[in-house]
Amino acid sequence: MSEPVVLVVDDSPTVRKIVQLTLQRERIRVVTAGDGLTALAAVADEQPDLILLDIMLPRMDGYNICQVIRKNMAYRDLPIIMLSGKDGLFDKMRGKLAGSTEYMTKPFDSIELAQTVKRYLDSPAARERAARREMLMQGRLRRQM
């Protein structure tokens, strides 16, 4: 089976790079997006196993991205972890109401982040998503030949 795929959505190139390096050490393929609309396109194109999603983004905020993703039945159990500098109770509740699975605050501990991501990626639902993605990618390759 192929490596799990995590979509990291953050407008900070530094945060994207730190998360990417952290997860690549765990043999996780990382796809990045710097704004909301690019993130939605990446969800459709890459079929990630998990999304790490900032809240404050250009073109569409993380709450709205989460709501759009959750409207698609294919992504109803896709883990979405909001990763934000906003640490108030209201922000966390708003994230849950938008459909996030979990909420972590920045600055984050790299080890804790990797453990949290791996916990979701090791679930039976994640393995099922990975198998569906692999079948989808094989179908795309056959159509290109």
Q: Locations of the language-model features?
A:
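Charged docking surfaces used in two-component/phosphorelay signaling
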Residues: 17-25
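Short hydrophobic/Thr-rich beta-strand motif most characteristic of the beta2 strand and flanking loop
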Residues: 27-34, 42-43
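Active-site beta3 strand of CheY-like receiver
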Residues: 46-52, 57
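C-terminal output helix
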Residues: 108-117, 129
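CheY-like receiver
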Residues: 122-145
